[in-house]
Design a protein with these regions (language model features):
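Edge beta-strands of extracellular beta-sandwich domains
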Residues: 2-7
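Extracellular/secretory pathway-exposed regions associated with glycan biology
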Residues: 8-90, 95-174
Length: 174
């Protein structure tokens, strides 16, 4: 028999957008080198490189997908900033990243999973405008799958739409 799936229905009010002055395009990314198997291990990291990225794909842009990753120096990254939600509504969110947070709420937690296909999609009611965003990427071989081969993207789908769309650079700010 197949695995039982539990679906929780929760009535939500729209999470209000943030009033932020002087935003610039992109996200702030902090990257640390080392082999980390879970988010808690990142607290031990002492050397972080800070940069600005225009797109979530830049988290692992220098990795040649579908090639050997033996030459890749292991690293993990945290990208923070804001996501601009185009209109009020309930949004379904999907990602193969380790974690995705919106407005300080952990929405996607792929801890302990092979990051090949997201199994922890979720939804949240969001008002139009800027919302805090945090994306955690753990670069490693987890469950036999190199996370470096994943696209470090987030997909959104408004509840009245049929298809997910990528979060695009014009939606990201810091």
């Amino acid at each position: 028999m197949s695995q039982t799936r539990t679906i929780t229905v929760e009535k939500q009010t729209l999470a209000p957008a943030k009033e932020v002055a002087n935003v610039t395009p992109g996200l702030i990314m902090e990257k640390t080198y080392g082999s980390f198997l879970n988010v808690n291990e990142l607290a031990k990291a002492t050397d972080w490189e800070k940069s600005t990225i225009k797109d979530l794909a830049e988290i692992n842009k220098n990795i040649v997908r579908w090639r050997s990753i033996r030459a890749v120096k292991p690293y993990s990254a945290i990208a923070t900033g804001y996501i601009n939600i185009p209109e009020d509504g309930v949004y379904f969110i999907s990602s193969n990243n380790e974690e995705v947070w919106i407005d300080g709420k952990l929405l996607i937690n792929n801890a302990g999973e092979t990051k090949r296909f997201s199994r922890h999609d979720t939804s949240i009611a969001l008002a139009k405008g800027l919302h805090e965003l945090k994306v955690v990427f753990l670069g490693n071989r987890l469950g036999g799958w190199p996370t470096y081969w994943n696209l470090c993207e987030i997909e959104l789908r408004k509840s009245d739409n049929d298809k997910f769309v990528w979060v695009t650079p014009d939606m990201l700010f810091h």
